[in-house]
Design a protein with these regions (language model features):
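C-terminal catalytic and target-recognition region of SAM-dependent MTase-like enzymes
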Residues: 286-289, 293-370
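A short, flexible beta-alpha/helix-coil linker loop
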Residues: 100-103, 159, 304-308
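Non-catalytic nucleic-acid substrate-recognition regions in nucleic-acid-modifying enzymes
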Residues: 2-136
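C-terminal edge-of-domain segments
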Residues: 140-156, 367
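Conserved S-adenosyl-L-methionine
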Residues: 174-291, 307-308, 314
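Short beta-strand/turn micro-motifs composed of small residues
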Residues: 10, 258, 338
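SAM-dependent Rossmann-like transferase core, predominantly class I methyltransferases
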Residues: 151-187
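Residue-level signal for inorganic ion chemistry
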Residues: 22, 95, 142, 302, ...
Length: 370
């Protein structure tokens, strides 16, 4: 198979981090755009990206791109795409996509046209008047932006933020990809004492442990392309072997605390499922009263937002109490994510730096104190 172009969509604000991550994986020609990152490679690169990418949402093959101002343009562009390189005659190929700022603005109509064109192309190539679609799934995705169409083939299936360890969560889940991003922003590599005082279901601590171990986040899950006839099974076997060979061994100091014992029980279950249960200490404690576990370290947390678990005023009071509690914790570098636009006011001090991110569709800032 020739070199392919791959696209890794990501949450807004994580593009640079994802680009750096893909470069560290030795993937080639990495290019960063808004909410997505491109790279080039073969199926081995695709498998590595799926297994090892912590902050991207999925890995897709760019099949073709073209301009379309009419449904006929869209039909002909898709029909000219060599889908048979990947999709066999019995393959199922559902279509998803979106359109923004384009003449072709009806997504259901665009889906129907893309599907019709794909059926026409594959029917002609395989000499079939009807395609059974009884085989494995080859998810087609399209993007139409300012009348420019990109057609993709999704290799991941379920979004990469679903690692396979978090089957239960409390009321305020932070995406695993966002948790990994926060740990990366804190530059945690396993040497510092790491503490999440609002650990909830344990996601930030678990992602920190996996980063400390250099453990590939996708080892405990499967991917759509694993079932494709065009991708040799040895590709996945080799990628998993190489990922395991890159793991570190060591002792790490990771603490997750929370005032809610039910959340802590879920966190412990999730940590065990992730294979890092022995690396994380979970402790029931009030973040506004708990003694600092050590004189210095990294504090990374996602305190309750007013939009969800607490009323807004209660959340604001919590931020104030937490800020007063940490007033003299000068040895701690703090990375706190919040959707409260006046967080610094309630916390009691201005951040040294802040970075706008989106947790799903919720606009947040990571406030950095060091």
């Amino acid at each position: 198979m020739d070199t392919m172009t791959f696209c890794v969509p990501c949450l807004f604000g994580l593009e640079g981090l994802v680009g750096d991550e893909l470069r560290r994986l030795d993937l080639q020609n990495v290019r960063v755009e808004d909410r997505r990152v491109f790279f080039e490679g073969d199926f081995a690169a695709m498998a590595k990206a799926n297994l090892c990418c912590r902050m991207g949402e999925r890995v897709m093959i760019l099949l073709s791109e073209f301009d379309a101002h009419s449904f006929e343009d869209l039909f002909q562009g898709v029909k000219a795409t060599p889908l048979e390189r990947f999709i066999p005659k019995d393959g199922a190929f559902p279509v998803k996509g979106y359109s923004l700022n384009s003449q072709l603005h009806s997504v259901p109509d665009c889906q129907a046209i893309v599907k019709k064109a794909a059926v026409t192309r594959l029917g002609e190539k395989y000499g079939l008047g009807w395609l059974p679609e009884t085989g494995e799934t080859y998810q087609l995705r399209f993007s139409i932006m300012k009348d420019h169409v990109e057609l993709f083939l999704d290799t991941s299936g379920v979004s990469l933020h679903k690692r396979g360890y978090r089957r239960e969560a409390n009321l305020a889940p932070l995406h695993e990809t966002m948790a990994a991003a926060m740990v990366n922003l804190a530059r945690y590599r396993g040497r510092d004492f790491f503490w999440d005082p609002f650990c909830g279901s344990g996601t930030i601590c678990i992602e920190a442990a996996m980063i400390a171990l250099n453990r590939a986040p996708g080892l405990n899950r499967s991917f759509m392309a694993q079932k494709w006839s065009c991708v040799p099974e040895t590709i996945w076997q080799q990628a998993r072997t190489e990922a395991l060979d890159r793991e570190y061994r060591g002792e790490y100091h990771i603490l997750g605390s929370d005032i809610d014992p039910a959340s802590l029980e879920i966190a412990q279950q999730n940590a065990r499922k992730a294979g890092v249960g022995k690396l994380i200490e979970f402790r029931e404690a009030d973040a506004t009263k708990m003694s600092l576990p050590t004189d210095k370290g990294l504090l990374v947390c996602n305190p309750p937002y007013g939009e969800r678990m607490l009323e807004q005023r209660s959340a604001q009071r919590l931020y104030g109490a937490f800020g007063r509690h940490l007033k003299y914790a000068d040895g701690w570098k703090k990375y706190i994510i919040s959707s409260e636009p006046e967080f610094e006011h309630y916390f009691g001090r201005q951040a040294v730096k802040k970075r706008k991110l989106y947790n799903g569709r919720l606009q947040c800032n990571v406030y950095m104190y060091y």
